[in-house]
Amino acid sequence: MVARKVKYCMGAVLASLFVFSACNLQSGRIETVSLIPVWYGDSCLYINAEDKVEFSGLYPSVSLFREDIALVQTAERDARIGFIDNSGEFVLPAVYKQATIFREGMAFVVRPGEAPCAINQKGELKFTLRDAESVETYHEDMALYSVREKGKLRYGYVDKRGETIIDPVYSGAMSFSQGKAAVRDAKGKWGFID
């Protein structure tokens, strides 16, 4: 029964990996996934391609490894997010309330009571988006972020120095892909920008 549950979870993860890899075809590359998370009871096991457990931890929520780092949420009552390496060791401590995966060498993190900050893989602060309500991972050197203006969310794009490249004037937006991003104007009409 337990083996069937683990195989079912593994099948679901593998199916989602197929879909996830297909999304990366747009950028012309398929990412190799070296370790896959599966849950067994309260433990998250990271297994390799030979179905061998590399390490485990009590993590209720995890990510796949991206740029050799995975995001994990601790199981404590006041759960926090940190980043682990391929051996399961924390490379950045679990002190964040929210975080994104690393992409293009950077991730966004939020400490309790603070604004989103961009960090590198060493945990060094690159910049803070003081007015941002949300921020996504980098795509083509730009990250989509939102601010609240007169009760409404507005979306714009920031570069890796923290400078706004495209002002937050859109009522909806998507990340850049192949040099273009879908955006929605104030009238609700969608189009593309480059």
Describe the residue ranges of each PLM region.
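Bacterial N-terminal signal peptides
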Residues: 11-21
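Residue-level detector of conserved, function-critical positions
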Residues: 23-194
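Intrinsically disordered, low-complexity segments enriched in polar/charged small residues
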Residues: 9-12, 78
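Bacterial N-terminal signal peptides that target proteins for export
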Residues: 2-10
